């Protein structure tokens, strides 16, 4: 253990032993990927590589389209070029929130970009445009196949200093049902696709002209979100072995429900949010009324004194509150997804 790792160990050990939603654990050595994942890249990079019109969302992008034949093709490379540094076994747990030091009113907005092997799920440009206009940091959990089918949008999110990308598995596989190599592929193929697009971005002349800003883009995602919010001990262990922090949530927007209004989303979040909360929503065609809800939520949360941060910054601000299982709001409440979706990949 390096002296830096030791300092993190001492800090998180002293922060506290438990919180209402689970145990506070120490993240034994937050690596450099987390340390630079938010706010490090210069905003000049994104402005140099894309015009305002190219960054702006288009209404037709959000539409979900079927993809036939089903796409079972792997990425051009099957794993990232550098081996991951595995996390300790104490980190093979589902992080639901963070207990911030001094009860700081921090909240992490997270948006899933999931995609299976038989569809193309789109991009909610209105939502991303709003976050940029309001200067709201956010974390996007992108599936590997989503990144491959939306390469330009992926690179824009990657280059934006407001945002960070996390791993959301290759084709939204249910890691509580999948086993062994299938889980490895869901994780590593996504890491590899991120690296492919990062290298593609760095090869562009706009990035070559800004080497310091380009280098500050994280080499790989540092956090992972389980598709369907499902996991077991084996899946948690494989995610930690891949060097990724397993991130769940403690605030549910419910935006996949078509019948839920923006105002219902606003009420749900405001009723659930606490200092250190992680909010789950969607930034593709799977979310309904998400952008409209955020138009109200962002100023409402700021009025309550909350400051928006990425998941990586939230992890550095206190002790993660983690549990040994994955669930939506109560243990066992997502077991139905195993029956409904099985492997979950299409």
Positions of predicted regions on the chain:
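N-terminal hydrophobic targeting signals that begin at the initiator methionine
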Residues: 1-3
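Bacterial N-terminal signal peptides
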Residues: 5-16
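N-terminal pre-catalytic segment of deacetylase/amide-hydrolase enzymes
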Residues: 17-111, 116-122, 154-155, 297, ...
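Active-site beta->alpha N-cap acidic-glycine motif
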Residues: 65-176, 182, 188-215, 220-221
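Catalytic domains of cell-wall/extracellular-matrix polysaccharide-remodeling enzymes
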Residues: 148-152, 170-307, 311-328
């Amino acid at each position: 253990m390096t002296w830096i790792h030791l300092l993190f160990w001492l800090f998180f050990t002293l922060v506290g032993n438990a919180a209402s939603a689970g145990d506070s654990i120490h993240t034994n050595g937050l690596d450099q990927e987390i340390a630079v994942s938010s706010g490090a890249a210069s905003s000049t990079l994104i402005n140099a590589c894309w015009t305002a019109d190219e960054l702006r969302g288009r209404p037709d992008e959000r539409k979900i389209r079927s993809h036939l034949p089903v796409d079972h093709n792997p990425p051009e490379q099957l794993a990232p070029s550098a081996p991951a540094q595995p996390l300790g076994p104490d980190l093979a747990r589902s992080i639901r929130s963070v207990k911030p030091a001094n009860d700081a009113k921090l909240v992490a907005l997270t948006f899933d970009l999931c995609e299976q092997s038989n569809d193309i799920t789109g991009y909610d440009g209105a939502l991303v445009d709003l976050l940029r206009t309001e200067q709201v940091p956010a974390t996007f959990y992108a599936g590997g196949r989503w990144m491959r089918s939306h390469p330009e949008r992926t690179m824009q999110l990657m280059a934006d200093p407001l945002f960070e990308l996390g791993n959301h598995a290759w084709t939204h596989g249910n890691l509580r049902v999948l086993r062994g190599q299938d889980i490895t592929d869901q994780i590593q193929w996504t890491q590899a696709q991120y690296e492919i697009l990062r290298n593609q971005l760095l090869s562009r002349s706009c990035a070559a002209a800004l080497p310091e800003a380009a280098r500050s883009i994280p080499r790989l995602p540092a956090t992972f979100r389980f598709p369907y919010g499902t996991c077991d001990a084996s899946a948690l262990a494989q995610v930690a072995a891949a060097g990724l922090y397993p991130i769940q949530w403690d605030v549910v927007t419910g935006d996949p429900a078509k019948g839920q209004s923006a105002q219902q989303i606003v009420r749900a979040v405001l009723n659930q949010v606490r200092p250190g909360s992680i909010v789950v929503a969607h930034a593709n065609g799977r979310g309904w009324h998400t952008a409209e809800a955020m138009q109200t939520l962002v100023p409402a949360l700021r009025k309550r004194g909350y400051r928006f941060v990425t998941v990586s910054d939230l992890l550095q601000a206190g002790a993660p509150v983690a549990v040994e299982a994955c669930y939506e709001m109560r243990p066992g409440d997502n077991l139905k997804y195993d029956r409904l979706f099985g492997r979950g990949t299409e």
